[in-house]
Design a protein with these regions (language model features):
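Structured secondary-structure scaffolds
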Residues: 2-225
């Protein structure tokens, strides 16, 4: 029986809830072509995890949650889509985005914040778009090598979810299934992705949420710092 992970209670109330989904299933052929092209560059662990998701049939992923904390969806602020149609926002009030949908986008936002701080420190005022776009958008980023490091549990979010988001902004699929570029400055996909197996410690993997591992305060104490 389902039960609360917090209290253990089986007094569960089932509620209906409307959510937004990232249509990952549409991108499976494009992702497979991209990932297969990285076999000689990425560790086998990474490509095998990514291709396993595709081989099992890529499912659309819910990208909103009913939580009090998170990046708000704010659907009432949305404008029309590229075809001019307004989205159906009924039932989306109070939703927040799923963390692994919005967190990788922050990689781009962090670059903008860095570029802005650099420009202000240099006395040039706020950053210009090209100051941060040259790291993320083609053709300005043609000379950039983009590398990610992560544990194996985060590989799917960076080989499937985030690439789907970027490809979906860069390209459009026609009714006949063909894709065409619609973004004059397409977002750059990761070049090198290094995924690693978990490090076990006292019978389980290192985990911040479970407080298992050697953390900075403990490391400093061991070093006598």
């Amino acid at each position: 029986r389902p039960r609360s992970a917090v209290s253990g209670s089986e007094d569960i109330e089932i509620r209906g809830s409307k959510h937004l989904f990232l249509r990952q299933s549409l991108f499976s052929p494009k992702l497979r072509h991209w990932i297969e092209g990285k076999r000689s560059q990425w560790p086998n662990l990474v490509t095998s995890i990514a291709l396993k998701w595709l081989d099992e049939g890529l499912q659309d992923r819910g990208i909103t949650r009913d939580l009090e904390w998170g990046v708000p969806v704010n659907a009432f602020e949305w404008g029309p889509n590229p075809e001019g149609a307004l989205p159906d926002i009924e039932g989306l009030a109070g939703k927040v985005f799923y963390v692994w949908f919005d967190a990788p986008i922050e990689y781009i936002a962090a670059t903008w914040e860095w570029a802005d701080a650099q420009a202000i420190e240099a006395g040039r005022g706020p950053a210009k778009d090209e100051d941060w776009e040259r790291w993320w958008r083609q053709p300005l980023a043609a000379d950039v090598t983009y590398v990610e490091f992560m544990g194996k549990d985060n590989v799917p979010f960076h080989t499937v979810g985030f690439p789907c988001t970027l490809i979906g902004v860069n390209e459009r699929q026609a009714a006949d299934g063909t894709w065409s570029m619609v973004n004059n400055a397409p977002w750059k996909l990761v070049d090198q992705l290094k995924g690693f197996n978990w490090l076990d410690y006292y019978g389980g993997k290192f985990s911040t949420s479970q407080k298992r591992g050697v953390f900075m305060d403990q490391a400093l104490e061991l070093l006598g710092g």
